[in-house]
A protein has these predicted regions:
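Single conserved hydrophobic/aromatic residue that forms the stacking wall/gate
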Residues: 197, 204-214
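Domain-level signature for soluble enzymes in the chorismate/prephenate branch of the shikimate pathway
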Residues: 1-202
């Protein structure tokens, strides 16, 4: 039986179940092995303040190298630029929507402004790339760290002092989350003129399948 290594978030499990279903369709029996990564364990500080790399992948890669699991599923954007020696990417999913979504409380909307957000709005994101992009369009906004999985970050938007948060469209769509209670600005690089400032994370929307070398 093949062991599939995955993080335990709802989105990570969706991705693992999707691979599990594909393998079942060709007659492969599998089981999921949930692995906590450094990024899962440290939730109170931004990524730029955490030392090292592979925040959401290293522990899973270690399990592959030690043959505790047979295959891993990762969001491609979480993988380090350089592959770990002894590991390889065996396959990729079809690409989902690569856009970022600016998810705005309706009480904080100002359609006359570039981001459709009121002046001086507080936006939750822990991504340096996203912070630079947002402040390019509206220097008045304040970007503050927000951590957690997709449902957790939406709960923080509803219950804490944020006017908006940024999420990857692919994750929202995979989880089937209803965003009707919010105003949405989609940063789709296919439609926006200024590609430099609306570019998503490289490889966003792709899932990688990484096998053990054993």
């Amino acid at each position: 039986m093949l062991k599939i290594g995955t993080r335990g978030s709802k989105l990570a499990l969706w991705q693992a179940y999707d691979l599990q279903a594909q393998l079942k369709a060709i007659g492969e029996d599998t089981e999921l092995v949930i692995i906590k990564t450094k990024g899962d364990q440290i939730q109170d500080i931004g990524f730029d303040k955490i030392e090292g790399k592979g925040f959401f992948t290293k522990e899973i890669e270690d399990a592959l190298l030690s043959s505790d699991i047979d295959i891993a599923v990762h969001s491609m954007k979480d993988l380090p630029t350089e592959m770990v020696e002894g590991l390889s990417i065996a396959g990729l999913s079809s690409r989902a929507n690569p856009a970022d979504l600016l998810i705005i409380k309706k009480s904080s909307v100002d359609t006359s402004r570039a981001l459709k957000l009121k002046e001086g709005a507080k936006i939750g994101t822990s991504s340096i790339r996203r912070k630079v992009q947002l402040q390019h369009f509206d220097p008045s906004v304040e970007c503050v760290d927000v951590r957690g999985n997709v449902p957790t970050r939406l709960t923080k938007l509803d219950t804490q002092d944020y006017d908006a948060i940024v999420l990857a469209a692919a994750g929202v769509e995979r989880l089937g989350i209803d965003l009707d209670n919010y105003h949405i600005v989609e940063f789709n690089p296919k439609e926006y003129v200024c590609l430099l400032y609306t570019s998503p994370s490289p490889r966003d929307g792709l899932l990688s399948r990484m096998p053990s070398s054993a």
